[in-house]
């Protein structure tokens, strides 16, 4: 670009006019912004949200303390402690997920052989303190008990793709 061309581009503010033209073109078109708390966008059936621990129909926890989810977690967000019961089966005494570390990759859900740990469709949860996002076994079971019908329906809908 020669010095004369550069002078006329900057003197007549052609870049500014191009930017204003672009802005003017989109001023009267449909807006892309969603006002989130009032308006909701559709959620994908494979959305990975809040974690939950599931139970069998008889009320027993599904988790067999194999610790595969703990081993596969790339963020090291899962902590499991277990003990052996009288009938030589293992069950968890501690199952904690630190949601401040979790990257919601879904590896824990994929690795679980008994579909105990699942990621629900829940995306609206919060904590006022950092410790509020540290979910214990009882909290995860409560989430699973509360949303079991939704979790079962999502699992059934996703079954052909697994």
UniProtKB/Swiss-Prot annotation:
NCBIfam families, sorted: NuoI, PRK05888.1-4, PRK05888.1-5
Family as reported in the entry's similarity comment: Belongs to the complex I 23 kDa subunit family.
Bilayer disposition of the protein: Peripheral membrane protein
Subunit structure comment from the entry: NDH-1 is composed of 14 different subunits. Subunits NuoA, H, J, K, L, M, N constitute the membrane sector of the complex.
Principal location class: membrane
Single biological process term from Gene Ontology: aerobic respiration
EC number annotated for this UniProt entry: 7.1.1.-
Reaction(s) the record says it catalyses: a quinone + NADH + 5 H(+)(in) = a quinol + NAD(+) + 4 H(+)(out)
InterPro entries reported in the protein's UniProt record: 4Fe4S_Fe-S-bd, 4Fe4S_Fe_S_CS, NADH_quinone_OxRdtase_chainI
Binding residue positions for [4Fe-4S] cluster 2: 73, 102, 105, 108
Source organism, top-level taxon: Bacteria
Classification via SUPFAM superfamilies: 4Fe-4S ferredoxins
Cofactor binding annotation: Binds 2 [4Fe-4S] clusters per subunit.
GO molecular function: 4 iron, 4 sulfur cluster binding; iron ion binding; NADH:ubiquinone reductase (non-electrogenic) activity; quinone binding
Subcellular locations according to the entry: Cell inner membrane
PANTHER family per the UniProt record, alphabetical: NADH DEHYDROGENASE [UBIQUINONE] IRON-SULFUR PROTEIN 8, MITOCHONDRIAL (PTHR10849:SF20), NADH DEHYDROGENASE UBIQUINONE IRON-SULFUR PROTEIN 8, MITOCHONDRIAL (PTHR10849)
Cofactor or coenzyme needed: [4Fe-4S] cluster
Pfam families for the chain: Fer4_7
Protein name: NADH-quinone oxidoreductase subunit I
Enzyme superclass (EC): translocase
Record keywords: 4Fe-4S, Cell inner membrane, Cell membrane, Iron, Iron-sulfur, Membrane, Metal-binding, NAD, Quinone, Repeat, Translocase, Ubiquinone
Binding site residues for [4Fe-4S] cluster 1: 63, 66, 69, 112
Originating species: Burkholderia cenocepacia (strain ATCC BAA-245 / DSM 16553 / LMG 16656 / NCTC 13227 / J2315 / CF5610) (Burkholderia cepacia (strain J2315))
GO cellular component, as recorded: plasma membrane
Domain annotation 4Fe-4S ferredoxin-type: ranges: 54-83, 93-122
